Curated annotation (Swiss-Prot):
Subcellular location field: Cytoplasm
Its biological purpose: Forms an interface between the RNA polymerase II enzyme and chaperone/scaffolding proteins, suggesting that it is required to connect RNA polymerase II to regulators of protein complex formation.
Induction cue: Down-regulated at low calcium levels.
Organism: Saccharomyces cerevisiae (strain ATCC 204508 / S288c)
Protein name (database record): RNA polymerase II-associated protein RBA50
GO biological process: transcription by RNA polymerase II
Family that this chain belongs to: Belongs to the RPAP1 family.
């Protein structure tokens, strides 16, 4: 028995094999391998999975189409305004529509309404060849515009007219890649308008303007406003030294050290000594010149200022040679920023108000001549007139209002100031206040 034989090549292109089920299967000549086995029956799970995938593809395709249509064809301004107007009309009742029509006819010119209706009819003829509204005869208060059911028949606004009214430029398409520049003349007009319409914030601050001016100034111009102490020359060294007790001290000081500056004598008056002697025949012509001490008593003008150093009645106000404080000065000190100074002034004002209400100023002895006696009568009438002048001064100076503000915690934080103000108001009430109000 021969085990080895000749090797014979077979033709595989037409080779056909049969399966167990009697079906024929052909080999894949392209790859040289048999095809994968694909069973005919598919499980129910795979069928449901395929259905879900197909449904997702359909829904995603529809959404993409909707998005594409919405992005490709956006609503114009005219269309959006038209839709908004229709929504507003849908939400209105027939009575409201009639009322709005009457308001329009009463407020607008009939010629203007006729022109608007003519434009609407013109657009409606272009679409339907029939006018939407009848001709109007110009009678105010008559409406021929239909009812609420015909709001859907209203033609939309013209896109070009709306864009011109809203100053909207036409948008270029996606495929357009060219750039359009405005004319140079328009840019110049805009710049000129911007220059003429300067805002308040566009103006530079004063300090910045001064700094800019200084940058463009020469050194000679800058040194005109600047002065320095000159070096002592040999002639100045030989001059005699200045004596502060010299009556011409200010003139010599200016001549030696500041000859280039103008003389300002008024600013040096505070350096002058206070007048020591007062006129014994000093007459107080007005109650605003009366001065008081811290107890609320009157201070005569003959009292020397040297004797009041320990009591603190010397001051730097008007007439520093006179001791004490006037009501006007005390009211000014009652609004001081220093609480201690404010407390003393408020306490003094309270005592003065009490004594004015009690009429306890026995120092007020007026000189009554014949004319005064004929005009006012007795001494009591003259005294009442003087006290009335004091209360008028307090009213004009708003002393009571100032004390009320000082006693209010909303306006005054310092507790001591509030307590002194409350005490001063209490003294004012206890004294009786203005005697004229009692009558």
């Amino acid at each position: 028995m021969d085990l080895l034989g000749d090797i014979v090549e077979k033709d595989t292109s037409d080779s056909v094999e049969s399966n167990d089920n009697g079906t024929l299967s052909t080999n894949n000549c392209g790859t040289g391998f048999p095809e994968l086995y694909k069973p005919k029956k598919i499980s129910s799970w795979k069928e449901r999975l395929r259905e879900k995938r197909a449904q997702k593809k359909k829904t995603s395709g529809k959404d993409a189409e909707k998005q594409q249509t919405s992005t490709d064809a956006p609503l114009s301004e005219a269309k959006s305004i038209h839709n908004e107007n229709i929504k507003v009309l849908q939400g209105m009742s027939d009575e409201q529509i009639v009322q709005e029509r009457e308001d329009l006819y009463n407020s607008l010119d009939p010629k203007l309404i006729a022109k608007l209706l003519k434009n609407i009819n013109k657009r409606a003829k272009d679409e339907n060849n029939t006018p939407l509204f009848a001709e109007i005869e110009g009678a105010s208060g008559t409406w021929v515009g239909g009812n609420k059911q015909g709001i859907y028949d209203l033609p939309p606004l013209d896109d070009e007219d709306v864009d011109v009214a809203l100053e909207i430029r036409p948008m270029l398409g996606k495929d357009a890649k060219h750039v359009q520049f405005e004319e140079a003349g328009k840019e110049k007009d805009v710049e000129e308008e911007a220059k003429t319409n300067d805002d308040v914030d566009d103006i530079a601050p004063l300090d910045f303007q001064m700094a800019q001016c200084i940058d463009h100034m020469k050194n000679e111009e800058l040194f005109k406003d600047v002065h320095f102490i000159k070096e002592e020359s040999q002639n100045e060294i030989n001059l005699e030294k200045l004596d502060i007790n010299d009556p011409n001290f200010n003139d010599k000081l200016h001549e030696k050290y500041f000859p280039d500056l103008p003389k300002e004598v008024d600013k040096l008056k505070w350096m002058q000594p206070v007048q020591q002697k007062t006129d014994k025949n000093y007459i107080i012509e007005d109650v605003s010149e009366c001065r008081f001490d811290f107890n609320g008593d009157l201070v005569p003008p003959t009292r020397q200022i040297d004797s009041t150093i320990h009591s603190g009645l010397h001051h730097h106000s008007d007439s520093p040679e006179l001791a004490g404080y006037t009501i006007v000065e005390l009211e000014h000190l009652a609004r001081s920023t220093f609480p201690s100074q404010r407390c003393i002034a408020i306490q003094t004002l309270g005592r003065i108000l009490y004594k004015l209400g009690q009429k306890s100023y026995y120092q007020l002895v007026p000189e009554i001549d014949a004319d005064t006696y004929k005009e006012d009568g007795s001494i009591s009438n003259v005294m009442d007139k003087i006290y009335s002048m004091f209360w008028d001064l307090i009213k004009d100076g708003k002393v009571i209002e100032s004390l009320e503000i000082s006693s209010d915690e909303k306006f005054t934080r310092n507790l001591s100031v509030r307590n002194y103000a409350i005490d001063a108001l209490w003294l004012w009430k206890q004294g009786g206040g203005d005697f004229r109000t009692k009558k």
